[in-house]
């Protein structure tokens, strides 16, 4: 008799995705981040759902409703801090997942990679709108500054901005629509995740060597299910430690001051996970140029497959490319640091140098070094 998991219309989809899925035998821990992102998304949707039951999206009561959640709702403080720090864990896993894709050449699966870029944009939009909801000082001014960038778009910028605001400034209608979109987007993200997995399972997973692994496959369960569960435990332990010991470590103290349109905080900055892009935005003295650089800092991932000039897929056996990759990582850390600093000397020039290097490495140095490595292979 055939097992029900292989015949049942619903169970066989789950079976072919998580049980009998053939997987390369050499996958390292860098392949854990996909499943960790799934757990992060689940945690965010669950905690967000319970928070939404107590939150009110009105400028008069939003800040107080968050205070009420933390003080009066059973384990409301836990829900709030799990949700806020869960977003940080989400982005840590996201950036490591993208970094893994860049290092091991996973971007050659173009459909999976492009859906991944769409997912990155969707998650960033969700996180930005979520940061506005507590209606603290940094929420309000962050929303004002970032949405204001749309006014740099020629001809339609100002009209588009007022349409998004629902008025002439960030106000009640802006908060209400941001809450609606913040609630809706995670479900769109979930649908995109399914498409991402669909395309991934069409080709099968890449592996650290970058060499086709068809002759050497193992079933996903029990080998990688156990490995993923270990990853869950490590990540959830880190999240629990952050939430229970230092919940405000990654937040901004200004957000504990209710939003006031009449006083501007000394340093307006987004959450830490957007600082690298914010630093690139601030490095360009022109408004439209800054906005284009900001968008391109993420969208540049879409042209990485076109710029792949190496004869090898993975960087595992390419030491020169590895040096450039880790230099790129160092530059991203530098940009993240600069994004949190005030706009003054020497931070301005450091930010501009790092921004130029970021684009140069991806667009010019990496393809060039790959060609040099191809030449060295002939020796």
UniProtKB/Swiss-Prot annotation:
Membrane topology summary: Multi-pass membrane protein
The keyword Electron transport belongs to this UniProt entry's keyword annotation: yes
Superkingdom of origin organism: Eukaryota
MF term (GO), any: ubiquinol-cytochrome-c reductase activity
Entries under Pfam families matching the protein: Cytochrom_B_C, Cytochrome_B
Annotated positions binding a ubiquinone: 201
Location in or out of the cell: Mitochondrion inner membrane
Note: Heme 1 (or BL or b562) is low-potential and absorbs at about 562 nm, and heme 2 (or BH or b566) is high-potential and absorbs at about 566 nm.
Record's subunit section: The cytochrome bc1 complex contains 11 subunits: 3 respiratory subunits (MT-CYB, CYC1 and UQCRFS1), 2 core proteins (UQCRC1 and UQCRC2) and 6 low-molecular weight proteins (UQCRH/QCR6, UQCRB/QCR7, UQCRQ/QCR8, UQCR10/QCR9, UQCR11/QCR10 and a cleavage product of UQCRFS1). This cytochrome bc1 complex then forms a dimer.
Record function comment: Component of the ubiquinol-cytochrome c reductase complex (complex III or cytochrome b-c1 complex) that is part of the mitochondrial respiratory chain. The b-c1 complex mediates electron transfer from ubiquinol to cytochrome c. Contributes to the generation of a proton gradient across the mitochondrial membrane that is then used for ATP synthesis.
Protein name: Cytochrome b
Organism the protein comes from: Artibeus aztecus (Aztec fruit-eating bat)
Gene name of the encoded protein: MT-CYB
